[in-house]
Amino acid sequence: EYSPGGKSHKHGHVNEAAFYILDGAGYEIHDGIRYDWKAGQVAIVPNNCVHQHFNASETKPARALVIKTKPMYMFMNMLFQHTVEKRPKTPSPTQGNFVPRQEEEDYNYPTDEKADA
């Protein structure tokens, strides 16, 4: 889900992803090319594509069901994901009470004792 006026961090990964848009309207930037989407459509992110997701509405959230092949890449030890531009630390235009996360779990490469369990 992307809040009104929200966006994801700019990133890339080796696995593809499919986004079935449940509600709202927005767009993606894939390697510098814009692709618009709305409810009922599917957005495809191809392998090795630097991309970012945007909610085009200033008043309504955008929601999507995301389908990825990431587990297969993890199983084959071929997962590579890289953040190109970090998540925004400022509120989206309509979300004045936004508080950024102070910490974020990295479930791909855990560093605590749970990883050894």
Q: Can you say where each PLM-predicted feature lies in the sequence?
A:
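Conserved beta-strand segments that form the floor/walls of ligand-binding pockets within enzyme
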Residues: 1, 44, 66
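Double-stranded beta-helix
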Residues: 52-116
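Short histidine-centered beta-strand/loop micro-motifs
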Residues: 7-13, 36, 54-56
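Glycine- and acidic-residue-biased ligand/ion/polar-headgroup-sensing regions
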Residues: 4, 14-26, 31
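Conserved short histidine dyad/triad with adjacent acidic residue
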Residues: 1-12, 47
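Hydrophobic/aromatic beta-strand elements that line small-molecule binding cavities or substrate pockets
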Residues: 18, 41, 51-53
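Short acidic-glycine-tyrosine-enriched beta hairpin
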Residues: 32-48
